[in-house]
Swiss-Prot record:
Any single GO CC term annotated in Swiss-Prot or TrEMBL for this entry: plasma membrane
Ranges that cross the membrane: 21-41, 56-76, 83-103, 109-129, 141-161, 162-182, 202-222
Keywords: Cell membrane, Membrane, Transmembrane, Transmembrane helix
PANTHER family assigned: BAX INHIBITOR-RELATED, PROTEIN LIFEGUARD 4
Lineage of the organism: Bacteria, Bacillati, Bacillota, Bacilli, Lactobacillales
Protein known as: Uncharacterized membrane protein SPy_0358/M5005_Spy0301
Native organism: Streptococcus pyogenes serotype M1
């Protein structure tokens, strides 16, 4: 990654910044999808074997994922060359762990959830870019609600309520839809606050945020659409 790439302050510069971010999001989602495909088809027997005989591999990967999110975010904000490789490694590992979730659903359900996620992502991105309303308050509310969802999800691990799981998924869709819009507005604010002097590190940081929004939106919609799978 070139640490010295600078985007000039202008509509063209802002568009270039957005293009850079969305190309990174596309790379991340594409890499995750590719790894998930490998696990679900060529290596399906290995996936099932891990689920049945070695579930700690999955949990270990999930823990490493969590660590990589913080490492990638920190590296990106410091504009270090390691930020992009870490982001891509995280995306690949996330594809691995996602396959253990996706395997429980019908193929049509997965495609339906993915296409719906893409449509929501596109619509909310436009809203975030075009709206004149300050969404910083909404952003704080969404993060507060997200904490509540995490707590409720942990509680439901012990309760095992199907209805509670459904409600959590619906609320999660609303939360991540709001975050997609606010993150897109944040991209504009970061660009404007730095007078257009933003390097690749910020592009990776914002791409990571949008990637996480999309993946979590996809998982939430997958659970909603796949209730009967």
């Amino acid at each position: 990654m070139n640490d010295h790439v600078i985007y000039t302050q202008s509509d063209v510069g802002l568009n270039q910044f957005f293009a850079k971010i969305y190309s990174l999001v596309g790379m991340g989602v594409g890499l995750s999808a590719f790894v998930s495909y490998l696990m679900l088809y060529p290596f399906r027997e290995n996936l099932i074997s891990i689920l049945v005989n070695q579930p700690m591999i999955y949990y270990g990967a999930a823990i490493i994922e969590l660590i990589l999110v913080f490492v990638a975010s920190s590296a990106a904000r410091k504009n270090t060359p390691a930020a992009l490789p870490i982001f891509l490694i995280y995306s690949a590992l996330n594809g691995f762990t996602l396959s253990f979730i996706i395997v429980a659903y019908a193929q049509t359900t997965v495609f339906q959830a993915f296409l719906s996620s893409a449509a929501v992502f596109f619509a909310m991105s436009i809203i975030g870019v075009k709206t004149k309303r300050d969404m910083s308050g909404l952003r704080k509310a969404m993060f507060a609600a997200l904490i509540g969802v995490v707590v409720a999800s942990l509680i439901n691990l012990f309760i095992g309520s199907g209805m509670m799981s459904y409600v959590i998924s619906v609320i999660s869709v609303l939360i991540f839809s709001g975050l997609i819009a606010s993150d897109n507005q944040m991209i504009k604010r970061v660009y404007q606050a730095t007078n257009g002097q933003v390097g690749d590190g910020w592009a990776v940081a914002m791409a990571l945020s949008l990637y996480l929004d999309f993946i979590n939106l996809f998982i939430s919609l997958l659970r909603i659409f796949g209730r009967n799978d």
